[in-house]
Amino acid sequence: MAKYLIDKIDKIDYLHSSSSVRTFETSKYFINHIQFDKIKYDDLLYHSSATSMLNIIKNYTNEHQSVMIIAHNPGLTNLINQITNISLDNLPTTGLAEIDFDCDKWNNISRENSTLLDLIFPKQLK
C-alpha cells in the first residue's frame, strides 16, 4: 500500500497513528516512502470509537492540510461510514480511504462537506 501511495502522494503534513505495536510497524512502511512533516503516536487512537476519532480530528490545528491516520477497526470503518456517503462493511488492514473535506477548519468537518475520493484495499493491488 505504501508503494501505491508513492505514485499519488509524495508528502503528507501529518501522520497520526495509534501507539500500538501493529500500527507502529505499519507506519514504518509509509514513513519509508512518504515525507511527513510531523508524526505522532497516540494512545487515544488505540481502539477508539468513530465519535472519538472524529473529535480528535476536529481538534487538529489548521497548519495541517493533509493528514494520514493509522488506527483500528471497528472505529476506523465506522468513522468512514459516519463522515461519507458509503456503507463499508470493513476497511481491511492497510486499506486506504482518501477523504476530502470542503471546509476551512478541521473542526467544521461534517458529512455534508466530506467526499470520499478513493477507497483502496490491499487485494486490489496484487
Q: Where in the sequence are the language-model features?
A:
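Short alpha-helix plus adjacent loop in nuclease-associated cores
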Residues: 45-57
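Hydrophobic packing residues within well-ordered alpha-helices of enzyme cores
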Residues: 26-30, 53, 79-80
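Domain-level recognition of soluble alpha/beta enzyme cores
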Residues: 87-117
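An N-terminal RHG(E/S)-centered segment typical of histidine phosphatases
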Residues: 1-11, 33, 63-64, 77, ...
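Active-site-proximal alpha-helix that buttresses catalytic centers in soluble enzyme cores
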Residues: 1-44, 48, 90-91, 126
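Non-DNA-binding regulatory cores of transcription-related proteins
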Residues: 60-63, 73-94
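Beta-strand elements within well-structured catalytic alpha/beta cores of enzymes
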Residues: 16, 65-71
